[in-house]
């Protein structure tokens, strides 16, 4: 079974995000970029399937600028076999991403597509679901456990108030939650090996997908600053402030 893993290049989660002066978006110049953390979990799970004899090949695909090849190399250094870079400039909205991934899936014919439940830059949580609808495949979102049973998949999902287990007919699409696994760190030898692994380069035009933006960002702003807290001497003072100042009692 071949596993296809879409990954996204995003601002590193350790970086403090800065909004552009004109409010048109987030400042990306000279900012450290890395693989979306949820996608790292997807790559790790695909590699575990291969190591467990359930998968034969892991292919990483990314849609974005030429620099997205660095994100693919991260996946290759973790252990993926090869990569596909679909070059696209500017913001590519989830529906367009799903349409491109549909074309890639039709070419690659994977038995499983596993991707992060959302990207930490836009938090859309849409691509996996849209891709499943376009392909007509089974899907399970927010996976915290994934098991392969022949050509089927058993997925435990994180839902409000507990867990839900579903069984999918392959081929299928699974989106990952944080508790699915802990991604490995790429070793130095594997980082060096990744430089020699193949990355096929495509363009959006190769797949005939219209990536024209259908959404307009009106304004981007930073979260409002929080009012500083105060220390109280005792319970009586706390109750007084909650009653007279906060008005919650």
Curated annotation (Swiss-Prot):
One of its GO terms (molecular function) is electron transfer activity. It comes from the Bacteria. Keywords: Electron transport, FAD, Flavoprotein, Transport. CDD domains: ETF_beta (cd01714). Binds 1 FAD per dimer. Its cofactor is FAD; AMP. Belongs to the ETF beta-subunit/FixA family. The electron transfer flavoprotein serves as a specific electron acceptor for other dehydrogenases. It transfers the electrons to the main respiratory chain via ETF-ubiquinone oxidoreductase (ETF dehydrogenase). Heterodimer of an alpha and a beta subunit. This is Electron transfer flavoprotein subunit beta. It comes from Bradyrhizobium diazoefficiens (strain JCM 10833 / BCRC 13528 / IAM 13628 / NBRC 14792 / USDA 110).
């Amino acid at each position: 079974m071949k596993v296809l893993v879409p990954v996204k290049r995003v601002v590193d989660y350790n970086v403090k995000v800065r909004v552009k002066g004109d409010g048109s978006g987030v400042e990306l110049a000279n900012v450290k970029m890395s693989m979306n953390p949820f996608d790292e979990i997807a790559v790790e799970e695909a590699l575990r399937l291969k190591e467990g004899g359930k998968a034969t090949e892991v292919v990483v695909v990314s849609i974005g600028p030429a620099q997205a090849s660095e994100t693919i190399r991260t996946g290759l250094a973790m252990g993926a076999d090869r990569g596909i870079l679909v070059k696209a400039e500017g913001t590519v909205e989830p529906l367009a991403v799903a349409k491109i991934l549909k074309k890639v899936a039709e070419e690659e014919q994977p038995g499983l597509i596993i991707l992060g439940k959302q990207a930490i830059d836009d938090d859309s949580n849409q691509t996996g679901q849209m891709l499943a609808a376009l392909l007509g495949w089974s899907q399970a979102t927010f996976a915290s456990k994934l098991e392969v049973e022949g050509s089927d998949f058993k997925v435990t999902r994180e839902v409000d108030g507990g867990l839900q287990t579903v069984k999918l007919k392959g081929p299928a699409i699974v989106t990952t939650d944080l508790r699915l696994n802990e991604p490995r760190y790429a070793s130095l030898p594997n980082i060096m090996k990744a430089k020699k692994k193949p990355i096929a380069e495509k363009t959006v035009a190769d797949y005939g997908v219209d990536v024209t933006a259908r959404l307009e960002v009106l304004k981007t702003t930073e979260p409002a600053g929080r009012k500083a807290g105060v220390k109280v001497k005792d319970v009586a003072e706390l109750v007084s402030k909650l009653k007279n100042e906060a008005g919650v009692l």
